[in-house]
Amino acid sequence: MNKISKIFFFVLIFLNLVSCNKSKELKNNSFELSGTISNSTQPHLILSEVGKSGFTQNDTIPIDNKGKFSKNIEMTEPTLYSLALGEEYIIICPMVGEKITIRATENNFAGSYNIEGSAESELLKELNKENYNVRLSLKSMSEELKQADSIKYDSIRTNILEKYISTKQYQEKITTDFINNNPGSLTTLIALYRTFDGIPLFDYRQSLEMHKKVLQSLEQTLPDNQHTLILKNFIIEKEKTLSDNGATKK
């Protein structure tokens, strides 16, 4: 091979490498979602955007016969997504340019998943873990009450009620701490709307102060984001409702 041929050969290799790298690069308005689902029988994951009217399906992500999946997702602004596998789902909060990796098992998708490559989504994972543990505690209390001996029922019921109140106070604390420790993050919206045994932790009918606190921080970081505007309109609407109800009672 002469000198010119060698130069031409190396130029071709270089161009090929550049081409390969470009194909893997993310667009300016996208993020990468990949990972593995162990023991998967589902053909795909469903990615839905969390918005004002609930979940809006955004994309379907195929899962191959080895349980692996990978897809680049375009997004127009920071937002929240639901990632569903069968009947279970998790919430993620990706940012443009992130390469997110998720590993989970199919039979306990929401409880088993691990996530890397997305700081906001990792925060949600920790919040979800605490919420999952609270649900297990409530389930355990319910089972204990069902199996209680009729003779000892009253004392067992009193004991469970004390546990119930303590568990609620614990969830209120960790949820409030999460909001206080992550001001301006979209993840605080998930904390804001957390429920305990089906009842909102921060019920707007009692107080809108926590809603206003979350909004104040979001208006500093994401003033024009759809989620900020939705929360703002929600507060305005509920304040009017509360005001009208107060006037009616008078």
Task: Indicate residue ranges for each PLM-predicted region.
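Bacterial N-terminal signal peptides that target proteins for export
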Residues: M1-F8
